[in-house]
UniProtKB/Swiss-Prot annotation:
Subcellular location: Cell inner membrane
Keywords from the UniProt entry: Cell inner membrane, Cell membrane, Membrane, Transmembrane, Transmembrane helix
Membrane topology listed for this record: Multi-pass membrane protein
Transmembrane segments: 2-22, 27-47, 59-79, 85-105
Major site of localization recorded for this protein: membrane
Similarity field: Belongs to the UPF0060 family.
GO annotations of cellular component type: plasma membrane
Protein name: UPF0060 membrane protein amb1014
UniProt keyword annotation of Thylakoid present: no
UniProt cross-references to InterPro entries, sorted A to Z: UPF0060
Organism the protein comes from: Paramagnetospirillum magneticum (strain ATCC 700264 / AMB-1) (Magnetospirillum magneticum)
Pfam family, one: UPF0060
Length: 108
């Protein structure tokens, strides 16, 4: 099943793209950060269309849980700020919901 790797690709592409804008507007980085940021956001949008889902809304709902976990990984790895126990607990709840949506037996 390629759903999880595809969602992870989408998540890190979205987070990276949004972080480029954050770096420009909040961290004072060069506007040259915007070009790779926009390319990363385009990759994110493309990746989400590759998920095997019958409805966009279901794909986006499942993606939400993966995105939350990925955001905390980004915060820890890139911004060097480890998540606290409440971040981890909240992400666990969201990930559980996403996994139910992804792996639910449909049409059976």
């Amino acid at each position: 099943m390629w759903a999880i790797p595809t969602y992870l690709l989408a998540a890190f592409a979205e987070i990276g793209g949004c972080f480029a804008f954050w770096a420009w507007l909040r961290l004072g980085k060069s506007p040259f950060w915007l070009a790779p940021g926009m390319a990363s956001l385009a990759l994110f949008a493309w990746a989400l269309t590759r998920v095997d889902a019958d409805f966009a809304g279901r794909a986006y709902a499942a993606y939400g849980g993966i995105y939350i976990l990925s955001s905390l990984v980004w915060m820890w790895a890139v911004e060097e700020s480890p998540p606290d126990r409440w971040d981890v607990l909240g992400a666990a709840f969201c990930l559980a919901g996403a996994l139910v949506i992804i792996f639910a037996p449909r049409g059976e």
